[in-house]
Amino acid sequence: MRMNYQMAWPYFPEHEIDWLLKEFKNILQGNASLSMGPRVKEFEDIFANYVGAEYAVGTNSCTAALEIALRSIGVQDGDEVIIPVETFIATGSAVVSEGATPVFCDIDPKTFCISLKELKKQVTKKTKAVIIVHMAGMISPDALKIKAFCQQENIILIEDAAHAIGASIQGIRAGNIGDISCFSFYPTKILTTAEGGMLLCSDKELYEKANSLRNRGRDMSTQGEVYSRLGTNNRMTEFAALLGISQLKCLNDFLRTRRTIASIYNEKIQASNISHLAQPVIVPEEINHAYWRYLITLDPSIDRELIKDELDKDNIASDWAYYPALHLQPYFVQKYGISKGLCPVAEDSLERNFCLPINSTMNKEDALFVVECFIKAVQGQL
């Protein structure tokens, strides 16, 4: 029997599986489109309504959504896009693929999100956009200040909300902060469509461009094969959309489970004698964390490899977030001649962060077992 101590586990309740099988059969036996049909539109509408945006464009990945977002705002050769370095490769590769230059920005060690102070230092006349990443499902407490700063400087703000479905700040949901936002529905994410992504915005012109670009540049307002711009094939399938519709029905339960697990982890770690050696992210009252990952910062004296080895003995998965930092990935080192020391806070953070398992199949007993094993593993290094 599968143990529940996995870093991520796509979960579909039994009643949703029954519903999905019925709907899949209807598609396969009917005359409906297999791609970009009514279910995609339904998923887009429901998702946009959940987040609070006007428009949604379903794609086949978050990477595609990021590329389309940059193309929609007219990013081109010579432009600069500021990005945090504690993030997945796609945040940077999307910028390069659209011909712009990524400007690597350090993070706030307390949140693992982009530092507003460092961001301001990076702005030049060439800055076209800023991408903020809601790291591990945490919206930066400075997110609204970053939005105001970008508006003041006439810079487009893009949210990489791949981790953060259901997160919010001051009641504003992730995906409804920037000019454009992008979500991931990869199997490891809180909500999955196997492969898939979503672009959200509330500007009609941006929406029309994005809607066209994900469909090879086709003019979606006219009949026939009319192409008014150069796009790519990044369409979402009806099957992916059905998975998304099903998952959205369960999302509140998924989030409740994750927050319960995180609360247990927080309570037990803070009450233990290792609290000075393992510091979970502190979440301000105005923020609802989605907990795609549960991040801990370890004291430099603690060897995270040894902790991982100890947890492995109890079949408990563990991990750390995005190592090495984005700017130190071999591709970017070679292309831009970057060396260690450019973003010292992130470089230190990525040497010391640690993730305990958190997924929607876990229960309180699972969480208690995991955190007790973690505390014991850290105590073993005292």
Language-model features and meaning:
Residues 1-33, 357:
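N-terminal "arm"/small-domain region of PLP-dependent enzymes with the aminotransferase-like
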Residues 32-80, 94-97, 104-106, 172:
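Phosphate-binding glycine-rich loop
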Residues 38-45, 50-56, 117, 129-133, ...:
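PLP-dependent aminotransferase class I/II
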Residues 67-122, 129-131:
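Conserved PLP-anchoring active-site segment centered on the Schiff-base-forming lysine
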Residues 93-95, 149, 173, 239:
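Hydrophobic/aromatic ligand-binding patch that stacks against planar heteroaromatic rings
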Residues 98, 152-153, 314:
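Helix C-cap/helix->beta junction micro-motif
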Residues 110-193, 198-200, 204-205:
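Active-site phosphate-binding strand-loop segment of PLP-dependent enzymes
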